[in-house]
Amino acid sequence: FELLNEVVEQENAEAWNLLIAETVDAIRRIARDTIIIYGGIQWNSVKTLKLLEKPKDENILFTFHFYEPLLFTHQKAHWVPTISQTEDIYYPEAMDYYRTKSLPIGYQGEVVCKAQSQTMGTEFITEMVMEAVTAAKNAGVTLYCGEFGVIDQAPVEDTLRWFTDVD
């Protein structure tokens, strides 16, 4: 079972943890050994796995979705109105460029703006994924990347470089 895909609002973190506990208890009454999957708030962000309470159940997997940097992976996406619908975004590119361009997209761009990485590329990707790995280790659970990718509007060569870095 995956409990719910992409809980969004940050203020729902506590309520999400309560719902997880109640739902896991209910599932365990009818399916003791079935693996249960859930992720953090803000679209299953790597940054929010650390907000999940440590599970009391051993058949739990944490999931995360990886679309960072969102500015690149979601460029020209009609469902993200704060991202330019006309400008090509390249990968990799200077970190300052990404930070400046990520500011207008609000908390969906915060991941880039708050990153410690000095370069946009493998250093940034590693920093992001290691946050998920650390959260899962601290919780004693297996980690699963449930979604990742790049929109078909991105330059093809840059998309291939992104996939190489994520690999």
Task: Please place each PLM-identified region on the residue numbering.
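Active-site region of glycoside hydrolase catalytic domains
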Residues: 1-119, 130-150
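Alpha-helical scaffold elements lining the catalytic groove of polysaccharide deacetylases
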Residues: 123-125
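C-terminal/domain-terminus segments
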Residues: 141-167
